[in-house]
Amino acid sequence: MNDPRKGADAEPTTHFGYQNVPESQKAKKVAEVFHSVAAKYDLMNDLMSGGIHRLWKRFTIELSGVRSGNRVLDIAGGTGDLTRQFSRLVGPSGEVVLADINASMLKVGRDKLLDKGVSGNVSFVQADAEKLPFPDNHFDCVTIAFGLRNVTHKDEAIRSMLRVLKPGGRLLVLEFSKPSSSLLSKAYDAYSFSLLPLMGKLVTNDAESYRYLAESIRMHPDQETLKAMMVEAGFDRVTYHNMTGGIVALHRGIKP
């Protein structure tokens, strides 16, 4: 968001967690977070969610409608949880592209998938979600899991995803969202701002990255706002499903 107190030539600012920073600095700061946590990313996901993130991702796979021969783009694919399942679904005649802007996360994902024997129909691309380096009307399905909140210009990223989808193609956005009850919200806040940074300190020696995680979730658009953004970008039949009381939401939209 722009700061109206600054002159017309001043660089626009945006949020990095609860901080207000120049737009050009956000990508650098986000990159530093993920360079720091990449090696322990999977372990922390299991610890933070009690393993429930695997159920959230399984539901994403089920709702994707991906089948044999499809071409899938997994944006912010990180350590490859979704890519691994999509690779199995699309088979040898299909293709999965794991894209991530962060080189450290991309390396961890590539190494992990190769160790598990996932190859042949998977490729790895370092890419910015706002400027996807793929042709128009190219993919049957695009997913972004726990990545959109880190993007500086979310509206541009959503339009970029629309562009690379084929007509009738599906976008699925899996992201932390707004809990549906005030009681759950209070408990979630206590966990996020107290236990999460402590866990990050103990496991990765980096409390600040997990403090940013908690703050970035609160700054991310809520369920209805993100739905409206997808409609505004040009998606049809946009719906969302709350999971774990709205702590996580899965949005789905179709390209006309």
Curated annotation (Swiss-Prot):
InterPro entries cross-referenced by the UniProt entry: SAM-dependent_MTases_sf, UbiE/COQ5_MeTrFase, UbiE/COQ5_MeTrFase_CS
Top-tier EC class: transferase
GO molecular function term, any single one: demethylmenaquinone methyltransferase activity
Pathway(s) the chain acts in: Quinol/quinone metabolism; menaquinone biosynthesis; menaquinol from 1,4-dihydroxy-2-naphthoate: step 2/2; Cofactor biosynthesis; ubiquinone biosynthesis
Residues reported to bind S-adenosyl-L-methionine: T79, D100, D128, A129
UniProt superkingdom: Bacteria
Catalysis performed (reactions): a 2-demethylmenaquinol + S-adenosyl-L-methionine = a menaquinol + S-adenosyl-L-homocysteine + H(+); a 2-methoxy-6-(all-trans-polyprenyl)benzene-1,4-diol + S-adenosyl-L-methionine = a 5-methoxy-2-methyl-3-(all-trans-polyprenyl)benzene-1,4-diol + S-adenosyl-L-homocysteine + H(+)
Coiled-coil residue spans: none
GO biological process terms on file: aerobic respiration; menaquinone biosynthetic process; methylation
Pfam families: Ubie_methyltran
Key words of the record: Menaquinone biosynthesis, Methyltransferase, S-adenosyl-L-methionine, Transferase, Ubiquinone biosynthesis
Family: Belongs to the class I-like SAM-binding methyltransferase superfamily. MenG/UbiE family.
Its biological purpose: Methyltransferase required for the conversion of demethylmenaquinol (DMKH2) to menaquinol (MKH2) and the conversion of 2-polyprenyl-6-methoxy-1,4-benzoquinol (DDMQH2) to 2-polyprenyl-3-methyl-6-methoxy-1,4-benzoquinol (DMQH2).
HAMAP family according to UniProt: MenG_UbiE_methyltr
Protein name: Ubiquinone/menaquinone biosynthesis C-methyltransferase UbiE
